[in-house]
Amino acid sequence: MAGGKAGKDSGKAKAKAVSRSARAGLQFPVGRIHRHLKSRTTSHGRVGATAAVYSAAILEYLTAEVLELAGNASKDLKVKRITPRHLQLAIRGDEELDSLIKATIAGGGVIPHIHKSLIGKKEETVQDPQRKGNVILSQAY
């Protein structure tokens, strides 16, 4: 068949498929995030192509930030495995992440905190006239 389309691609090698994540330089799956965004919209699934890339970049950055802080927390405690406790310490220790992530982390425990009014005053040293030396008073009566 002369003039047909059969020989159109015969001289060229087919280009290898490049994912949108690779094009954007991301590790998170842009295509999967785009699919989830489309399934959760009410306007008949119309989501711009760059919205998925931007969302994937945000999720990747936040994940990297939390994992870095949790890794530092686990390293401070001299263990090699990140646990929910380390994630809790990392998120609650950072002011911006704490305001962003309000979720309760299962198995995360609590953050130690003592209110300033409950902390005792500085110890005062008073000369005791009957004893030789200083006496430490923990509370003023």
Curated annotation (Swiss-Prot):
Modified residues (Phosphoserine): 138
Modified residues (N6-acetyllysine): 5
Residue numbers covered by motif [ST]-Q motif: 138-139
Chain intervals for the UniProt region annotation (Essential for function in development): 93-103
Single Gene Ontology MF annotation: protein heterodimerization activity
Start-end of Basic and acidic residues biased regions: 1-12
Sites of the Glycyl lysine isopeptide (Lys-Gly) (interchain with G-Cter in ubiquitin) crosslink: 121
Keywords noted in UniProt: Acetylation, Chromosome, Developmental protein, DNA damage, DNA repair, DNA-binding, Isopeptide bond, Nucleosome core, Nucleus, Phosphoprotein, Ubl conjugation
CDD domains: HFD_H2A
Post-translational modification as stated in the protein's UniProt record: Phosphorylated. Phosphorylation of Ser-138 occurs in response to DNA double strand breaks (DSBs) generated by exogenous genotoxic agents. Phosphorylation is dependent on the DNA damage checkpoint kinases ATR and ATM, spreads on either side of a detected DSB site and may mark the surrounding chromatin for recruitment of proteins required for DNA damage signaling and repair.
Subunit (UniProt): The nucleosome is a histone octamer containing two molecules each of H2A, H2B, H3 and H4 assembled in one H3-H4 heterotetramer and two H2A-H2B heterodimers. The octamer wraps approximately 147 bp of DNA. H2A or its variant His2Av forms a heterodimer with H2B. Interacts with Nasp; this interaction directly or indirectly destabilizes His2Av.
Free-text domain note: The [ST]-Q motif constitutes a recognition sequence for kinases from the PI3/PI4-kinase family.
Identification of the protein by name: Histone H2A.v
